[in-house]
Amino acid sequence: GSLRVLSIIFPYTNRIREASKTAKTMPAEVYSVGRNFANEFMGDVLKKSVSFFQKKGYNAMAGMQSPVFQILTKEEPLQLYSVWSERHIAFAAGLGTFSLHEGFISEVGCNIRVPSVITDAPLEISPRKSDDPYANCLFYTTGKCKKCVERCPADALSDKGHDKLKCYLYLKTIEQEMKPRLSGLLKPHQRVVNGERNTSFPLGCAFCQFNVPCTSKIPVKERDEDNRD
């Protein structure tokens, strides 16, 4: 039978968003802990979702937990790739669109995590409201905004998009600064990079997702509603 993908959106809490509004160079500690714990939480949700479908007699698999999931890198210049994109799956599922900062802008904003499950269960299909991959982003729809560019301490964003290398290097800077401070709280996260298992302690950054028009909503939708009024 045909396959379905169940895409799930988990927004960060208002407490984390409020604490992160004023962060300038290092993320709020409550965000970094939340970002770190989110990996294990999402993994548990995915395992239980897969188990639910399998007990109903259907096949199911979480892309992130597949043995073939990995991060690939290319040298000179360094480039990063993933063999599975949760954001592209969420777009295909009709949950939102992409943005200038390459986050995913959903009905509850861009400050989210987005895991998914593949199954042959006959799930109802949710239609996309737009086939435009950037329909929810103010910059791409109006040519204005760029608040995420202003918020990025790594200078990794511009009107040309997202420089993944600058972003990655700044994440490493954050890890060096924050890991000793939060070491008693952090959980290790394992993933495969270029075929080799790698252990890290994800702490996040996400300055581009906090204190911006798309943090918790679709700003384009709000603008359109204001225009109708």
Question: Would you name each region that the model predicts?
Answer:
Residues 1-39:
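Non-catalytic, usually N-terminal nucleic-acid engagement modules in DNA/RNA processing proteins
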Residues 26-229:
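Catalytic cores of enzyme domains
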